[in-house]
């Protein structure tokens, strides 16, 4: 009997279901093609015939997007796998679950859905009101009395892929106290669909070339190079200014950075700019980098050879400069007037006097170049820098033309360089006779010398320097010892301490008047009178030493002690060695 009652109940339920489907089909003929009936009527779940928006329709459904924070204020529902009934059906799961528009009925989940491959979904179909796929059962819902349910609030707007919409059916005040999201985030404003993510984070434009050139003109070389690292693209004029700035700065680090940016530019094949790079590295005393740039140049001109030879000569490598000159002639390049000026500079560096005269003769005889004033001055520089002052003076007098003031001025500088005071005074007189305006220059007060802020003393001290002396140190030491015995003999009687003889001689060297004279000679120009004031009586050894010093350096030394003034001139004192 119980089995018959179960069959009747099932048949009665099917009749009601068939009537509902026929009514829905007659109301919306366009949906008739979307219905598919399988062998049993239980394949159509009643849930798909409802348009109610349950709060947990997205739960465990991979096809629907995740709802926002305020659309899931209720805890997840649990269902009995056997009875398929909600264990929390006595508790409202959403604000609209027991509304009058739903007829006060709890939706039942039964049957199989052909949309899911014949399997029953855990919570029924997806709701179009909550961003899911459109259900196949559109139109009027028979469970709502044949009318479409009306929901209070506006239809959610879908602004983008993030589905940042607000469900007006669920109010913030009705959120359940049983469930709190772990990470509550504020809803983000919708982003326009035609706005790309790259436009959200705007990148600052690279610095302009004018900014780099402006910093170079203000001598802010480091800041200018930092703009290159930030993406500035210098043009040809900007590279010229950068190379000149690095050459004046004499900083190898900055020069290499600028050269790296130059190699990445489109001007790396410009011969003029490459010549400036050679000159820049030569000023920074980096001959290796200058030679590397010179070797990698495809189109070398005469300026390239001249600049490389000058870089060798300025850094004391005159032999390499002369070898480069021979290599240039082997390549078939004909030297010009400027070429021989660099050759004379290289000869002066290595002391090649004979070689300089040979090149001077070949310039006239072999290459047909008429010597100019610059070439005669170049040969004079070879003689003067090597210390052959007598030969240099005779060379000036044997010139085929009347010497100008430039020759006598150069000769005066060479005499001052080697400490020949008499020759220096004589050359200055000849210079003034030829050009009286030269004498006026010394009377005009000159401005204080500029501070060389561009020079990095730490960098210059880290270089390896090589010094050469033409005489042997042993012979020079013997000569100095011999002169010491003839010219000056320390008088140790004025040392009252009980120490040995050598210590007494060392103690005499640290008397205050001697230190003052040494400091004055270093800091003052030649032949300037020095005045030393002392509060004690000058000792006899210092008195004898100052007389000899006044004759050697050619100055007038005035010493004031607690007794009187001592005027030392030409090895004599005004006191007559009595004070």
Swiss-Prot record:
The keyword Secreted belongs to this UniProt entry's keyword annotation: no
Low complexity biased stretches: 117-136, 148-199
Residue interval of the organelle targeting sequence: 1-49
PPR repeat feature ranges: 235-269, 270-300, 301-335, 336-371, 372-402
Entry GO CC: chloroplast; mitochondrion
InterPro entries (UniProt xref): DYW_dom, Pentatricopeptide_rpt, PPR_At4g14850-like_plant, TPR-like_helical_dom_sf
Compartments reported by the entry: Mitochondrion
UniProt region (Disordered), positions on chain: 56-208
UniProt cross-references to PROSITE patterns, sorted A to Z: PPR
Composition bias, Polar residues: 56-71, 78-103
GO molecular function: mRNA binding; zinc ion binding
Alphabetical UniProt keywords: Mitochondrion, Repeat, Transit peptide
Single GO biological process annotation from the record: RNA modification
Region named Type DYW motif: 485-579
Family: Belongs to the PPR family. PCMP-H subfamily.
Protein name according to UniProt: Pentatricopeptide repeat-containing protein At2g15690, mitochondrial
